[in-house]
Amino acid sequence: MTLQELVHKAASCYMDRVAVCFDECNNQLPVYYTYKTVVNAASELSNFLLLHCDFQGIREIGLYCQPGIDLPSWILGILQVPAAYVPIEPDSPPSLSTHFMKKCNLKYILVEKKQINKFKSFHETLLNYDTFTVEHNDLVLFRLHWKNTEVNLMLNDGKEKYEKEKIKSISSEHVNEEKAEEHMDLRLKHCLAYVLHTSGTTGIPKIVRVPHKCIVPNIQHFRVLFDITQEDVLFLASPLTFDPSVVEIFLALSSGASLLIVPTSVKLLPSKLASVLFSHHRVTVLQATPTLLRRFGSQLIKSTVLSATTSLRVLALGGEAFPSLTVLRSWRGEGNKTQIFNVYGITEVSSWATIYRIPEKTLNSTLKCELPVQLGFPLLGTVVEVRDTNGFTIQEGSGQVFLGGRNRVCFLDDEVTVPLGTMRATGDFVTVKDGEIFFLGRKDSQIKRHGKRLNIELVQQVAEELQQVESCAVTWYNQEKLILFMVSKDASVKEYIFKELQKYLPSHAVPDELVLIDSLPFTSHGKIDVSELNKIYLNYINLKSENKLSGKEDLWEKLQYLWKSTLNLPEDLLRVPDESLFLNSGGDSLKSIRLLSEIEKLVGTSVPGLLEIILSSSILEIYNHILQTVVPDEDVTFRKSCATKRKLSDINQEEASGTSLHQKAIMTFTCHNEINAFVVLSRGSQILSLNSTRFLTKLGHCSSACPSDSVSQTNIQNLKGLNSPVLIGKSKDPSCVAKVSEEGKPAIGTQKMELHVRWRSDTGKCVDASPLVVIPTFDKSSTTVYIGSHSHRMKAVDFYSGKVKWEQILGDRIESSACVSKCGNFIVVGCYNGLVYVLKSNSGEKYWMFTTEDAVKSSATMDPTTGLIYIGSHDQHAYALDIYRKKCVWKSKCGGTVFSSPCLNLIPHHLYFATLGGLLLAVNPATGNVIWKHSCGKPLFSSPQCCSQYICIGCVDGNLLCFTHFGEQVWQFSTSGPIFSSPCTSPSEQKIFFGSHDCFIYCCNMKGHLQWKFETTSRVYATPFAFHNYNGSNEMLLAAASTDGKVWILESQSGQLQSVYELPGEVFSSPVVLESMLIIGCRDNYVYCLDLLGGNQK
């Protein structure tokens, strides 16, 4: 049975059914072909090829095209000759394609007419002046000419000696000697189906010739396992050069089902692709790599791909390590019934070898499972063996996987005959437990990157062959970045070397970064010291200075340069046209990520939403998007920035119902309230600016992470004073650990500080709440501190003098910290009596009270885009309040008491709550619907803290946990005591500070690695505050408090003690610092303002 016979059998039953659909996703109607049309077109192509091709020896025909409606007909037409099809990817590096075609000794190639110019320009050396060409519909047939052919597989029957040598070499791969007399021969007329090459990154690229007998059992078995019928719609997710594409195409066309094809560029746009697959075409079967699925983002996966109403019956994930069960469960919407499979295989035994269906019971279980998903059972005709280092098959323990089967054999490189039952080494290591096989990882330095195997030594070899590189080494930094370290006499060749690597390496093997170093570090054994290289890279990213832009014109010129260098465009291209699109100019997903990285390095900050803009918009639109973030106009551009970013955060349009409500809310307060301009400081270094664009532009505090009127919802910058911009401190010595001496004396710092009481204000009882400092933009002298107490009092105190401006008695104790409204006219605070109070900020007069069903100790958070107030309650609910309309917009059950404070992230627009039941929840700020949740297993008193990439939170089990904004846990850092302290990030978002009940203050980097820790004299409950030394230096400091009443001032880079001051009572309040003054509450009933005096201020 051959692939084409499978299709003809199905076509005979379903002639008039749709076989193929091609949707360009450009607002034009999709194109459909019936089985009858596909078969007829294939027959015409077969006749054409038989007429014009003079086959001698092995029949192989290249196919150089992009995905389209005719693709299945073209493949089928080649197979019917009969011949094997050899896919050539037009976007692959020309040198790689040429090597592949030459090694195959490819004589004929069909080129899509749309790709003719690209083919001729990239491969002109293969075409003589008398090159034979002939056209057939949308194809052109070329006859290729090879000079000095290294490998010639057009063997005749007389080369027996050669064959015997091949048999001998193959038998060394542990072939059963009893079967040595039985072989598969690729010269047989109907033997081969297709020819591929391995990525070439696990060594020299291997040619893999796949017989029909090897691939057909895959198709037949999957049809049964997936229960494919004529009603199914399958998506062609894989490129032709990746062998799972064969399964996708022929699984559909051998079953009477329909195959959906879209342009490659659409696959790079997650929201658009999800809409096309599951809304427009109702795809029922999807085979994909985990990376492809992850591109959708957990929110879109849960709401669309794996929702309760999804069309998707079957999801088969393979090509990479299978996601953890925890992640998989977080992706599934409630009520989803999609069958999920783990498939595993290698190209050398094309295509898949094993399969495992994740049981519904396992998917629905709430029990935490740390075990990986098993590889499952062998597919039809496949033999799976696990062998130890001695080559013996094992039934228990760890070893390398070998794959094969009597007919499941392929021809590698210049093999002509292969013994049946040949077993191929995979390079994958597994463990066998109770008969089940679990994946461990790749052999030696082989890794999988972007779904493809990569041997990092190959990258080193290619780089070392470049004349400008004296020596080099490659590391897989933190298993996420490929870094090339180079020693070169010429420091200016970095860009040139990067271009050269792009020429000779496939895209997934191109390094993320090139780092120039003076010499390679070695171990005592004379080997490259990888750990030292990692330290060099850590210092490199911490210490590299920001690029400074001189203005808009400079940005445009540098963007043009990055565009040309990333796309490898000619240097003599004077100007990139304004309307140029990245994907149409030769870009792909990896290059887009590279361009994003280079732009963010150029501007010195992250640019939210930029990747989607790069993939879908012109260079001019990309420029404008960057401009709105990094070179904001004082008025107009900033407002544009707000609108643009808000639109990006709503890209999946899930908040449609909430949008009109928010608009009404904003209109209401705009009409009835005076809008003030001010800056707000609160615990954890949080800085928020509202309605004060002109003021902030002057300060240099424009942020990329927030809307136009928000400098930072999440620790973007700290104010040194209201007259000068902030400088960011970075750690130079990650291994430094500082602590108090046995006598309790502070360690010697570069410049000691002293703390003195400037003023204190009596509240009548303990102050556990943290201060809120509001700085009016146009009257800095009227800066006010708002804070509540267990005495039921809410106070407004003058920041500079400590004079009480007003005092309001509420109904019960106040532990909640205050929050300001968007207009600045109101202060919002929670109370033990279950009420949320809205007080007028200028008088303390009660404006509105909202009732919950239990105590409110949570502190409110305000959404600067809508003005909504979010707060949690001990009644186990989260609330969204419109204080202007005096109504509750939504109420969401959280599954546990909400003690900590919510955290709002703007892009993606998520609101985070944590419960004493151990749940961390991400909810939709517009509706209150849960987007994802994670059970930490222990109570969460700590408040979540957002930065541009991650969300961090402390747990009473002693761990600081870090998650992506899509709910995937990235890392956890363990301390020796419960964590009640909320984390605080540095202005650069490269470090995170927090305290623990083990009496230490910790500083970690964003990879979860300890930078330093400082031992205090008691437990640390409060949240630290990072700030700039007011003495005129560039020093970044950290203020923290321990429960015994000590206030600690540390140098943030190393954790070195600068000063300590002991208050007369316990401290559970968190400090806030402005200029040289620190505000904090104490259990001696007072709010304190401490003056921080440096050596030159005493």
Swiss-Prot record:
Record-linked PANTHER family: BETA-ALANINE-ACTIVATING ENZYME (PTHR44394:SF1)
EC numbers, comma separated: 6.2.1.-
Protein name: Beta-alanine-activating enzyme
Known role: Covalently binds beta-alanine in an ATP-dependent manner to form a thioester bond with its phosphopantetheine group and transfers it to an, as yet, unknown acceptor. May be required for a post-translational protein modification or for post-transcriptional modification of an RNA.
InterPro entries the record matches: AASDH_AMP, ACP-like_sf, AMP-bd_C_sf, AMP-binding_CS, AMP-dep_synth/lig_dom, ANL_N_sf, Beta-ala_Activ/Resist, PP-bd_ACP
Keyword terms, alphabetized: ATP-binding, Fatty acid metabolism, Ligase, Lipid metabolism, Nucleotide-binding, Phosphopantetheine, Phosphoprotein
GO molecular function, one term: ATP binding
GO annotation, biological process: amino acid activation for nonribosomal peptide biosynthetic process; beta-alanine metabolic process; fatty acid metabolic process
Domain Carrier stretches: 553-630
Tissue specificity of this protein: Ubiquitously expressed in adult tissues.
Residue numbers binding ATP: T198, S199, G200, T201, T202, G203, I204, P205, K206, D428, R442, K527
Modified residues (O-(pantetheine 4'-phosphoryl)serine): S589
Family membership noted in the UniProt record: Belongs to the ATP-dependent AMP-binding enzyme family.
ATP-binding among keywords: yes
CDD domains associated with the record: A_NRPS_acs4 (cd17654)
Superkingdom in the source lineage: Eukaryota
SMART domains reported for this sequence: PQQ
Phosphoserine: modified positions: S649, S724
